[in-house]
Amino acid sequence: MGTEKEEPDCQKQFQAAVSVIQNLPKNGSYRPSYEEMLRFYSYYKQATAGPCLVPRPGFWDPIGRYKWDAWNSLGKMSREEAMSAYITEMKLVAQKVIDTVPLGEVAEDMFGYFEPLYQVIPDMPRPPETFLRRVTGWQEPAVNRDVQAAPEPSHPPKEPAPPSPESRLPRDLDLEVFCDSVEQLEPELVRVPVLSPVPAESELPHLHTGTGDSAQRVWAEQKEAAGRELTTRSSPESPEGFGGSLMGPQELDRWLVGTVQAMQESMKDVHRRLQILESKPQPLEQQRSPRTRPWPLGLSTPTLLFFILWPFVVQWLFRQFRTQRR
């Protein structure tokens, strides 16, 4: 009986945690690490698809290998255990947000995204109630409201602002798409071996890319990562120049355009220098081509003729001498 009652609660909490992560803003105050995103992905896959039975992707798919390793590391963990681990990881993330992000810098709707978790997870970490009352008009835990409805206040509390369109994910995504909870992280993960690990530019809701677009972006990022060391000297600004964090799509496009322009200028400069070197007059010694020597041993023409003709001259003189003696 206890198990039958526990499974629906665990699944309900799991679905609520998935919904919260799916709705987190991309440009929020908290940026999860790569390890956290991979853990969320692995727990989700284990909870929805079971143990990893698919073969490991090839070397040409580094993102798939990262995700496969994270999923495969869970072994034969049951789906209920994976859901529980997912919820536990969600609690750790919520506590980390409370501990690391100053409450004075948190947007008013920041903790509004976690409100569904407060309704189904009683021990979900939450900020001080005074802060919740001040920024969101939150009065009491939603669990108590389910038991006993609270009276309406004299003035309606301030509703949490809905996420902006640019930070909100498409709602037509099915749950299976969300299982790849590091889809939007793929360009950043490709750069992990090249750049030092820094907080990701995008937040956890990174599921709006399809399989084809994801593969194209991975291939483009692989080429960009392979040529980064070659273009660093000629690049107008390196990736580390953007505030010490990874670049967003627009910043990456601007940086790539600048890099290509710098490379083109470098190639033009090299070509111009080569033309200048080719057009310079060569020194006299180099201009004077080595003179062909038709005569052997470097002998002059008269000397060579003398060596050729002297036997005949001697023979003729000898004959003249003999003729005169007779």
From Swiss-Prot:
InterPro entries noted in UniProt: Acyl-CoA-binding_prot_CS, Acyl-CoA-binding_protein, Acyl-CoA-binding_sf, FERM/acyl-CoA-bd_prot_sf
Boundaries of every ACB domain copy: 10-99
Region Disordered, residue ranges: 147-170, 223-248
Gene Ontology CC, one term: cytoplasm
Keyword Mitochondrion part of the UniProt annotation: no
Phosphoserine: modified positions: S164
Highest taxon of the lineage: Eukaryota
CDD domains in the record: ACBP
Record keyword Phosphoprotein present: yes
Keyword set, alphabetical order: Lipid-binding, Phosphoprotein
Residues annotated to bind an acyl-CoA: 21-30, 41-45, 67, 86
Alphabetized SUPFAM superfamilies for the sequence: Acyl-CoA binding protein
GO biological process, one term: fatty acid metabolic process
An MF annotation (GO) of this entry: fatty-acyl-CoA binding
PROSITE patterns membership: ACB_1, ACB_2
Protein purpose: Binds medium- and long-chain acyl-CoA esters and may function as an intracellular carrier of acyl-CoA esters.
Protein name according to UniProt: Acyl-CoA-binding domain-containing protein 4
